[in-house]
């Protein structure tokens, strides 16, 4: 039985919708995003631990990392569950795209449903930048927009 989820991204200048679909617990999750207001370039795109936006995106906590791993690229074995890499904005129109990820899930104990999706100001260095926060945040910078991931039809 497939599951779907949706997240409405809100920020001062950044807004959008992220949709998640997973056919079954063993299949990858398809992530479709449509976001406006991003400056040209790459922007970190992560699932954060908490579904709390009471203090803006800051209250979403760190990246979703139930296995205590270092930050990494979506293709890395050693990565946070919430590490979805970067999305690329042209700075002129909606930033749209699709990601397929085999680590996040809409099923089970480590579901991303109820957690927060965050779009960051800077490029995620995928844990390889050698900066003090590369292995925790990918040095992706400020949180421009976020929203709680909820169940959808």
UniProtKB/Swiss-Prot annotation:
Keyword Disulfide bond tagged: yes
Cofactor note: Binds 1 copper ion per subunit. Binds 1 zinc ion per subunit.
Signals that turn on the gene: By H(2)O(2) exposure but not by UV irradiation.
UniProt cross-references to Pfam families, sorted A to Z: Sod_Cu
Cofactors (names): Cu cation; Zn(2+)
Xref: InterPro entries: SOD-like_Cu/Zn_dom_sf, SOD_Cu/Zn_/chaperone, SOD_Cu/Zn_BS, SOD_Cu_Zn_dom
Positions annotated to bind Cu cation: 46, 48, 63, 120
Catalytic EC class: oxidoreductase
Gene Ontology MF term list: copper ion binding; superoxide dismutase activity
Disulfide bridge map: 57-146
Gene Ontology CC terms: extracellular matrix; phagocytic vesicle
Catalyzed reactions per annotation: 2 superoxide + 2 H(+) = H2O2 + O2
Gene Ontology biological process: aggregation involved in sorocarp development; removal of superoxide radicals; response to bacterium; response to cadmium ion; response to curcumin; response to hydrogen peroxide; response to oxidative stress; superoxide metabolic process
EC number: 1.15.1.1
Positions bound to Zn(2+): 63, 71, 80, 83
Keywords: Antioxidant, Copper, Disulfide bond, Metal-binding, Oxidoreductase, Zinc
Family (UniProt): Belongs to the Cu-Zn superoxide dismutase family.
Function recorded in the entry: Destroys radicals which are normally produced within the cells and which are toxic to biological systems.
Name recorded for this polypeptide: Superoxide dismutase [Cu-Zn] 1
Organism: Dictyostelium discoideum (Social amoeba)
Underlying gene: sodA
């Amino acid at each position: 039985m497939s599951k779907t989820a949706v997240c409405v991204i809100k920020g001062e200048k950044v807004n959008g919708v992220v949709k998640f679909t997973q056919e079954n617990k063993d299949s990858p999750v398809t992530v479709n995003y449509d976001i406006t207001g991003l400056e040209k370039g790459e922007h970190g795109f992560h699932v954060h631990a908490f579904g709390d936006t009471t203090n803006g995106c800051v209250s979403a906590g760190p990246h979703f990392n139930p296995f205590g791993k270092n930050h990494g690229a979506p293709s890395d074995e050693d990565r946070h569950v919430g590490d979805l890499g970067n999305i690329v904005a042209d700075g002129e129109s909606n930033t749209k795209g699709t990601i397929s990820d085999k680590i996040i899930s809409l099923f089970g104990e480590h579901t991303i449903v109820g957690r927060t999706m965050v779009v960051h100001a800077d490029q995620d260095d995928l844990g390889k930048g050698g900066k003090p926060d590369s292995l925790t945040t990918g040095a992706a910078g400020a949180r421009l927009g976020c929203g709680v991931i909820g169940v959808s039809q």
